[in-house]
Amino acid sequence: MGRAIAASAATISLSVELAKGMRKIAQFSLGDRTIDIAAGQDSVWAIVRRPNRGGLAVRLAHCWGGVSDVATLRTTGKECLRLRVRSAVGEQVVTIGSDDMSLPLIRVTTVLTSSTPLLVPYLPRDLYPLGKGDDPLRAQGQVEAAQRGLNSGLIYFHLDRPAFGSVLYFQNLTALNDYFAATGTKPDSAVGGEWPELGFLPPTPPQSGTPPTKPLPAGRAVTVSDALIVFHDEAVANEQNSARRFLQMLGAAYRQLAAPATKYHDWVERSRRTLRNLERAPEATIRHYGHTYIHPYTASEYPDVMVQMSIISALRNFAAWAEEDIPFSKALEQGLGKFHDRKLKTMRRYLPNVGRDKDKLAVDSWYLYHPLLNLGHLALAGDRGARRLFEGSLDFAIKAARHFGYRWPIQFKVDTFEVIVEARNDDGLGQTDVGGLFAYVMVQAYELTGRQDYLTEARKAIDAARNMRFELNYQANLTAWGAAACLRLWRITDEEYYLQQSYVYLASFFHNTAIWESQIGHAKHYDVFLGATALHDAPYMAIFECSDSFA
């Protein structure tokens, strides 16, 4: 006797209702997909089917106390269907639109007007793959990516048996800001689930002996869901095809969104003001060994080489664009040599006189290579001093890469390669995208010297990251540099493989972006739309990581 499959009450109830049959309300088609709208006991559903290839059940409206009445309303614009659904707690208006200009998709928006101040202790998920006989318990497939933290509310999966294809579910969290404000909640990892119960789990106040009482207001229309569901006929594929498909499907969803209006900023004036502040503010700089160095943070932390090189590279770019000399940049460059370890032949993170509260031998893996990237940038622009430091550090950079098998830990001792921190959490993964950054540095070395062995090192690093799929992103800017490295390798070698591998880096990068405009807390005071969160599990955006990704 086979082992019973564990399932939630919601999944079992749906399975039973589909077997018995629901009350049909409407039907329309989307390519070879038929979409039946039906009323169950406590929900109204859209059942999307492909002939003999399975389907998908989408919960359009959850009705506490049961579905009292469903009426079809007049549609407007691109709407396929508009419904008014009544239940014990009030009225919900559901609109369904469709588009197949690039990839077929439907958009389902549900607006709830409660008849009384409504506490929401729980709302069920809204997406169920359907197997043979419309049974969600017989659906076989795999989730490739789901929402991380407060990033985009998406889940990307494929239904293999039956061969329905791939699905990208994208919850437009921007439309739900009123719901979050009324209930005092955040959509933290709200889109995901355990197969086959997937989709959006609306956030609710934490439950306890004395739970918060933050109701949805009576008589006020509040959007509780604005879901975009994109379909693709293909399902199982290698990581490159899967990544490209994800980007295509995400692009189809993105085109349906109302992006924030472009605002004018005088970036040139801001750049000049920032330069003045760096030069004049005593909190910005510190003197060591007779040289000027930039503080990593305002009036705090010891100077480190990554910060110095990032500032110098940016100042060089601005000087070239403005066609003017910036003496402050040259002043900073004069102190770079103190970071170079002549014995190890590498750029060290800290100056030799760093305080005892720091481990002068400890280095995060990406800190070893990011300064070299900016040195390479200056070297390729003709800076002889930068070239000397860059080329003088390449052998050690390669030695470290080979020692770790092109799979770097979080932190290690620079003199012995002793690992200090192996993994970011219990998944055993280190800084998974450092290989992309290393590859970019190796491509720079190849362009500077013409030596094929540097190109070979770049290839090895990219190859070592195969099959990381959506776990590739450790830190946003490193993933972005990895995508750029793949594109450089493609142009140099003319090998299609590297173009395809760039999609893996890009897919992992965009998986970690917030494609919505939050009005929660302090976020209401600034734009976060399409911002990249700094780390794979970070609940914040950082100016450096965002700007470096853009660069």
Where are these regions (language model features)?
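Carbohydrate-recognition beta-sandwich/jelly-roll modules
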Residues: G2-G392
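Glycine- and aromatic-rich loop/turn segments at beta-sheet edges
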Residues: P205, R273-S300, G337-L361, K399-R424, ...
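Well-ordered alpha-helical segments within folded domains of soluble proteins
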Residues: T298-A320, K360-A379, L429-Q444, Q475-R491, ...
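Positions within ordered alpha-helical repeat solenoids
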Residues: N317, H377, K399, H403, ...
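Short sequence/structural elements of tandem HEAT/ARM alpha-solenoid repeats
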Residues: P327-E333, R387-G392, Q452-K460, E496-V504
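Active-site lining segments of carbohydrate-active enzymes
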Residues: L380-L448
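Inter-helical turn/loop segments and adjacent helix faces that build the functional surface
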Residues: A381, L448-Q452, L489-Y497
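Long alpha-helical HEAT/HEAT-like repeat alpha-solenoid scaffolds in very large eukaryotic proteins
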Residues: L499-A551
